[in-house]
Design a protein with these regions (language model features):
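Non-heme di-metal
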Residues: 1-146
C-alpha cells in the first residue's frame, strides 16, 4: 500500500511546527519586501554552497551536488530579480531574519560534525522556505504563485 503523504506533509513533519499566521499575513501585505528577502535568500544559499565547495574540495560527491545547487540557486536569484525589475521594486537593503543565524549558532566544531550540521541547517532552511511559500501561494498573483 502506497503512502498518501505528500512532500509538503513530510516537510511539515520534519519542521515540527508551522510558520505563524502573523508571518503569513505580513508576507502577503509586503510582497516587495518578501521578494527582496527571497532574492537575498537565494543569493545566500548559493554563497553557502560555494563556501562548502571551497572548504571540502576533496569531497568529489559533495562538489558535484554543491555545484548543481549553486547554479539552481543563482537561477532562482535571476528569476526573482527579474520579477522585481518588472514590478519596479528597488533592490534595497533588508536585514536578514534571525532564523538562519540562530540555527548556525548550533553548528558543532570539528570537520566531520561541522559539515553534517551545515547540511542539516541547509535542509531546515530550504524546508521552511517551501512550507512558507505553500502557505502564501494561494494569496499571490500568478507570477509569484507558481
Amino acid at each position: 500500500m502506497q503512502s498518501s503523504k505528500t512532500a509538503l506533509d513530510e516537510i511539515k513533519e520534519f519542521l515540527l511546527c508551522e510558520t505563524p499566521e502573523e508571518w503569513i499575513q505580513a508576507a502577503i501585505e509586503h510582497q516587495d519586501i518578501l521578494l527582496i528577502d527571497h532574492a537575498n535568500c537565494e543569493k545566500k544559499a548559493a554563497s553557502s554552497a560555494m563556501q562548502l565547495i571551497h572548504r571540502y574540495s576533496e569531497n568529489y560527491n559533495l562538489l558535484q551536488k554543491m555545484s548543481r545547487l549553486v547554479r539552481e540557486e543563482m537561477r532562482h536569484f535571476e528569476q526573482v530579480t527579474a520579477i522585481m525589475k518588472k514590478r519596479k521594486i528597488n533592490y534595497i537593503y533588508v536585514s536578514a531574519s534571525r532564523y538562519a543565524s540562530e540555527l548556525r549558532k548550533l553548528v558543532r566544531k570539528g570537520e566531520a560534525t561541522q559539515l553534517v550540521d551545515l547540511l542539516i541547517i541547509g535542509a531546515f532552511i530550504e524546508a521552511r522556505s517551501c512550507e512558507r511559500f505553500s502557505k502564501i501561494a494561494p494569496w499571490l498573483d500568478e507570477a509569484l504563485g507558481n
